[in-house]
A protein has these predicted regions:
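Strand-loop-strand motifs at the edges of beta-sheets in extracellular beta-sandwich domains
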Residues: 445-461
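Aromatic-lined ligand-binding clefts that engage carbohydrates, nucleic acids, or primary amines
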Residues: 12, 64-65, 140, 162, ...
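Edge beta-strands of jelly-roll/beta-sandwich modules across compartments, strongly enriched
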Residues: 73-81, 242-251, 387-401, 508
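Accessory carbohydrate-binding/adhesion or oligomerization-edge regions at the termini
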Residues: 2, 6-8, 91-147, 172, ...
Length: 541
């Protein structure tokens, strides 16, 4: 590993290139508007590590610019990964835009290895508030972890204050342990391992162990920490027997910036082992390659893909789906679920979505606000294709997101307009967890509300305009939201365009204009491969 000066920050970039146009691919690193480094030239089919010492920046915040000199984006299968001084992944992504994409990344550690903590041990009882920030630990001893060699008797308790940052997506906490452990952030339990259920006491013994002490971790939403303020990390270590033990605990906490645009979400960057019950090319479902895909054949639904995470265990509360140009064959309905008991067939639903529509080469993101948890394994069930009898999943990325609990129902649009009889109406809330849904006043004739999903669908039978309020429930809490709907008569000529094609339809388009090339003009991009597609009914003047 490269050794950096005290005023420098270590970083490792891993760049993957393919066999074509690798010489067009590069990246730059900035601190604000200041260019700090430019990547070296990369070779054909290369997986290359580049270590660098960056100058210190405010809170060690930087940005990476993904560049393609050919202005046709990186080749499918090319990606870049960024790791910090402890080898933890702080960014991983691939390029979809033609010539440039910009992402923030953070090399800030709220807690670093070998720092000073507060330490004590108990053999009988401990104050219940010991995990809270306001607890008085002045009587606890100071211990610099990693070099503290004294033995202590009983269950070991640790406390460490730290400062988090604003506008982050997640944090990664890795801890060095062998036996039982329970960790808390600001008084809330965030992790336990090798421990029975229930509130632990100093006499609670661990259950199970690793062969030796090593670092194991979690990635959780940054909403669990207070930005730019004091926080407390509290950890208790339990052992198979009550006795005297050495102190071999240590930990670090990395604060992670968003790795997708528009939403405060972090893409899981470590390797993932995937397996499926049916279909082909399952490894393509999450391989940072934009044109590879996993297929669920006709008549073989549901396609079940299990994600087994090899690095820190993520608290997945978001899913991002890349449809490439196959928007008609991308998953039209799915369930994302998790479980902690590998011997059980029971899975807990986290996110479910149906009647999904896509735009060609545009990500679609789904969130879970109240049904997420820290699971050992996750499963993605594809229930149907969006508009085909089979399904293709090009890239399904698990996300850890900083999400605020919703205060109301927000729809994909505040206002909708559709033509009478000729357009299929689909109106859905952005949050997919709402249920027990009702609407007032009554919907126009031809439309109905699904009370389980809050999705409104159908075809308007007559012209009407109005504002509608939907009431729904999440975990016994009522939420409300409204939208305006205009169902209008077509005053001109209705044109239905049907077009067939074999491949690369996303490169083609058409326009409809009046005779003097003014007024109406509508250009539609088509994206599904090898399918007959009815574009839409188009009203013209």
């Amino acid at each position: 590993m490269l050794t950096c000066e005290p005023n420098q920050v270590f970083v490792r970039f891993t760049k993957k290139t393919m066999d074509s146009y690798y010489y067009e691919e590069s990246f730059e690193v900035y601190s604000g508007s200041q260019l700090l480094m430019t990547s070296p030239s990369f070779a054909k089919g290369e997986l290359r590590d580049v270590e660098f010492c960056l100058p210190e920046s405010t809170n060690r915040q930087y940005s990476i610019h993904l560049l393609d000199s050919g202005r046709d984006s990186w080749q499918s299968g090319s990606w870049v990964k960024i790791a910090g001084i402890y080898g933890n992944i702080v960014f991983r992504n691939f390029m979809t835009q033609p010539n440039e994409e910009i992402y923030p990344f953070s090399l800030y550690y709220a807690v670093m290895k070998e720092q000073q903590w507060k330490l004590t041990s108990y053999s009988s009882t401990i104050p219940s508030e010991w995990t809270s920030f306001g607890f008085d630990d002045s009587a606890w001893q100071d211990a610099t972890l990693g070099s503290f060699t004294t033995q202590i008797s009983g269950t070991q308790y640790f406390r460490k204050t730290f400062t988090s940052l604003a506008n982050m997506a997640a944090y990664e906490l890795q801890m060095n342990y062998r036996y039982g452990i329970v960790a808390y952030v600001n008084g809330v339990e965030v992790f336990r391992d090798h421990m029975p259920a229930g509130v632990p006491t100093p006499t609670t013994l661990s259950e199970g162990s690793f062969p030796s002490s090593s670092y194991y971790g979690i990635i959780r939403p940054s909403t669990e920490t207070l930005p730019s303020s004091a926080n407390i990390l509290a950890v208790e270590l339990h052992f198979p027997v009550i006795g005297t033990s050495f102190i071999d605990f240590d930990a670090f906490m990395a604060v992670l910036a968003p790795s997708i645009p528009d939403d405060p979400c972090f893409i899981y960057g470590d390797e993932v082992d995937v397996s499926s019950n049916v279909g082909s090319n399952v490894n393509s479902i999450f391989d940072f390659a934009k044109i590879n895909y996993y297929t669920v054949p006709v008549g073989r639904f549901p396609g079940q893909v299990t994600y087994a995470f090899t690095g820190s265990r993520p608290y997945v509360n978001g899913i991002r789906i890349w449809p490439y140009t196959g928007y008609a064959s991308s998953p039209g309905a799915f369930v994302w679920e998790g479980h902690n008991d590998v011997t059980s067939s029971e899975w807990n639903e986290i996110i479910s979505a149906s009647s999904i529509t896509y735009t060609s080469s545009t990500y679609k993101t789904f969130f879970s606000y109240l049904s997420s948890d820290l699971y050992k394994a996750y499963r993605f069930q594809i229930l149907s294709g969006a508009a085909t009898q089979y399904a293709r999943a090009y890239e399904v990325q698990p996300l850890v997101c900083s999400l605020a609990v919703p205060t109301g129902i927000e729809f994909e649009s505040a206002s909708y307009s559709f033509y009478v009889e000729y357009e299929d109406i689909v109106i859905r809330p952005k949050v997919v967890e709402f249920t027990n849904c009702s609407v007032t006043p009554s919907l126009p004739a031809g439309l109905s509300l699904n009370p389980v999903t809050c999705i409104i669908s159908g075809q308007g039978e007559a012209a009407s305009s109005g504002t509608y309020e939907v009431t729904a429930v999440i975990h016994d809490t009522a939420y409300h939201g409204s939208f305006s709907l205009h169902v209008v008569e077509c005053e001109g000529t209705l044109v239905s365009v049907v077009r067939s094609y074999r491949s690369d339809a996303y490169k083609e388009s058409f326009a409809i204009q009046d005779a003097v090339n003014v007024g109406f003009a509508d250009t539609r991009r088509l994206g599904a491969l090898e399918e007959l597609v009815e574009v839409s009914d188009i009203a013209t003047p």
